[in-house]
From Swiss-Prot:
The gene is metAS. It comes from Klebsiella pneumoniae (strain 342). The active site is at C142, H235, E237. This is Homoserine O-succinyltransferase. GO terms for cellular component: cytoplasm. Disulfide bonds: none annotated. Its EC number is 2.3.1.46. It is found in: Cytoplasm. CDD domains: GATase1_HTS. It holds the Pfam family HTS. The record marks G111 as: Important for acyl-CoA specificity. It comes from the Bacteria. It is an enzyme of class 2 (transferase).
C-alpha cells in the first residue's frame, strides 16, 4: 500500500530516494477508495529515524494507508526538533474520539526501568484501554510488547541478566497462520532488548497463540485468535546500521557491550553490516495490514465492528 502522509513530512523525500511509494495527501484526495487509518504511537527517542523505518514497511501494499503520528510524552525531546513534533504529531486528546483501522506501538529504550517509573506509564495504559474500543488491530513492538503483556494480562516485567543484541534465527510454528503466510520456515530478525519473553510464560498465562519462536525458545511473534492484538518482540523495522549505531553508542559510553550476534561480517565491528531481515520485515507488516487490519475492519469507521472469523 502506498502510505499517505502530510506533504511536508521529511520521510517523503527520504523514502522516495529509496524508490519507496509514498503518496502525499494532495495526490490521495483524487482517489476514491478509503485509505486505512493507521495510528503510530512513537515511543523511540529518535522519532524521525523511527518514522522512516516503520513507514518503509507500511508502504509496500496496493491500498492507501493514512498515517497519523501520536505522542504521549510532553517532555522536551533531546533527539527530535520541537518543530517536527508540533507539525506532525498529535496528542491523545486530539484523536481519542476517533476510530482507527490499525495502531502500532513502537519499542522504547526502557528495558531496565520499572513500569511505574516510566514517565508516561499512565498514558500508555490509557491508550491501550482506549484501543480496545477504537482500533481494529494493534501491533506491539519490542518494549511495547512487555508493557502490553503487563497491562492487558497482568504479567510482571521479565528482565534478562544481559542485553540481547544481534540478528537471530527464528522458526514458524504454524505454517498456515495468516500472520506468517509466505514466511520461510526459518528466518532472521534483529533483537535489541533486556526484556525476556519465554514462550512457556506466554502459553501459561495468556490465551495468545505463538506463531514464531527463536531457536532458544523465546516467543518472537504471537497474537490473539481474533486478530485484534499482535506482538513482535524483535525489531524487524531496523535499518542495516541501527544495531551498529547502538553498539558504538554504548562503546563510547564506556558500557563495554558485547558485539551484536551474527551481525557484523566476521564478527568484526569494523566491517559494514548487511541487512538480512528486510524481506521478513516487509512480509510481516504486509500480512498484518492485509489479514489483521484490511480484511476485518469496517468500511464505516464510525461503527467499530470488526468482521471476525
Amino acid at each position: 500500500m502506498p502510505i499517505r502522509v502530510q506533504d511536508e513530512l521529511p520521510a517523503v523525500s527520504f523514502l522516495r530516494n529509496e524508490n519507496v511509494f509514498v503518496m502525499t495527501t494532495t495526490r490521495a484526495t483524487t482517489q476514491e477508495i478509503r485509505p486505512l487509518k493507521v495510528l503510530i504511537l512513537n515511543l523511540m527517542p529518535k522519532k524521525i529515524e523511527t518514522e522512516n523505518q516503520f513507514l518503509r514497511l507500511l508502504s509496500n501494499s496496493p491500498l492507501q494507508v493514512d498515517i497519523q503520528l501520536l505522542r504521549i510524552d510532553a517532555r522536551e525531546s533531546r533527539n527530535t526538533p520541537a518543530e517536527h513534533l508540533n507539525n506532525f504529531y498529535c496528542n491523545f486528546d486530539e484523536i481519542c474520539d476517533q476510530n482507527f483501522d490499525g495502531l502500532i506501538v513502537t519499542g522504547a529504550p526502557l528495558g531496565l526501568v520499572e513500569f511505574n517509573d516510566v514517565a508516561y506509564w499512565p498514558q500508555i495504559k490509557q491508550v491501550l484501554e482506549w484501543a480496545k474500543d477504537h482500533v481494529t488491530s494493534t501491533l506491539f513492538v519490542c518494549w511495547a510488547v512487555q508493557a502490553a503483556l503487563n497491562i492487558l494480562y497482568g504479567i510482571p516485567k521479565q528482565t534478562r541478566a544481559e542485553k540481547i543484541s544481534g540478528v537471530y534465527e527464528h522458526h514458524i510454528l504454524h505454517p498456515h497462520a495468516l500472520l506468517t503466510r509466505g514466511f520461510d520456515d526459518s528466518f532472521l530478525a534483529p533483537h535489541s532488548r533486556y526484556a525476556d519473553f519465554p514462550a512457556g510464560l506466554i502459553r501459561d498465562y495468556t490465551d495468545l497463540e505463538i506463531l514464531a519462536e527463536t531457536e532458544e525458545g523465546d516467543a518472537y511473534l504471537f497474537a490473539s485468535k481474533d486478530k485484534r492484538i499482535a506482538f513482535v518482540t524483535g525489531h524487524p523495522e531496523y535499518d542495516a546500521n541501527t544495531l551498529a549505531s547502538e553498539y558504538f553508542r554504548d562503546v563510547e559510553a564506556g558500557l563495554n557491550p558485547e558485539v551484536p550476534y551474527n551481525y557484523f561480517p566476521q564478527n568484526d565491528p569494523q566491517n559494514k553490516p548487511r541487512a538480512t531481515w528486510r524481506s521478513h520485515g516487509n512480509l510481516l507488516f504486509a500480512n498484518w495490514l492485509n489479514y489483521y487490519v484490511y480484511q476485518i475492519t469496517p468500511y464505516d469507521l464510525r461503527h467499530m465492528n470488526p468482521t471476525l472469523e
